[in-house]
Amino acid sequence: MEITKEKLAYLLFLYNQKDTNCTVTRLAEEFGVSKSTFSRVLNSFYHENLIIQKGKGILSIKGEKLTKSYLKDITEIKSWLKSISNFSDEEAYHEALTLVLVLSNKTRYKLITDLYKKKLFEKIDKVKSISGDMLAINLEDGKYSFAFTIYKINKLEISMANDGFVHPGILEIDNGKGNLILFPKEIEHESLLGNIILKGQVESLKYMIDQEFINSRNVKNNYIIPIDRLQFHYCKEERILQTSIKIKVRADVGIIHMPESCAVLNIIIK
């Protein structure tokens, strides 16, 4: 569905008027267009399932969800623009409205998540660490990429397990709960004889909490580690959050089941 600036302006207007129960005539007057123009827009919205009834300015669940997502991003970008410039409220709003439409979805999402992280870092500016459960409460819902490296236990050497996952990983925050998500990928391993390339992938992942290894949940072949009992350390100078957790990884490479090995998963969020 293509969203133009004009179309989004109508959706935002209807969203703000949702509790007024105004007639189409009154809505058109408030918006500053003729009744016929407003009715044509409503007719278009009805065919796109954005309003619940033909000729009524009441957003459907789909329309409200779409509008709220844009409004949330506009609000964040507006606040950011005001913090870095001398824009008035109205100027910042219109610039933010333009930005959410001209940016690609990927760039827009990255900008918004970066702004969310900026707000988090401002909140924890005077602390050296934050628990995972508090991190999940203070960080807006979303999916945040994180860099990670898996090291051999008690060594500054990168573990073979590091190649068993897609980089970066994802920290997913949803309704005050947070999970680290690791995406396994195909591993290539040269046989001891050196003439055969064996292929496979991570078969199981365990993580240590309170000196006990716990099986990671596997959802759609992705490994999930809850963050609620992890401790994140904050570096103010570099604006990064970092945590480490011991893990056990077992890989299935061809006909060979490689033994379960211990390693350290080091995570950086910036």
Where are these regions (language model features)?
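A short, conserved structural fragment
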Residues: Y46-K56
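Basic amphipathic alpha-helical segments that dock to polyanions
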Residues: L27, T37-E48
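Short acidic, hydrophobic short linear motifs in intrinsically disordered regions
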Residues: D19-E30
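Basic, amphipathic "hinge/linker" alpha-helix immediately C-terminal to the N-terminal HTH DNA-binding motif
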Residues: G55-D73
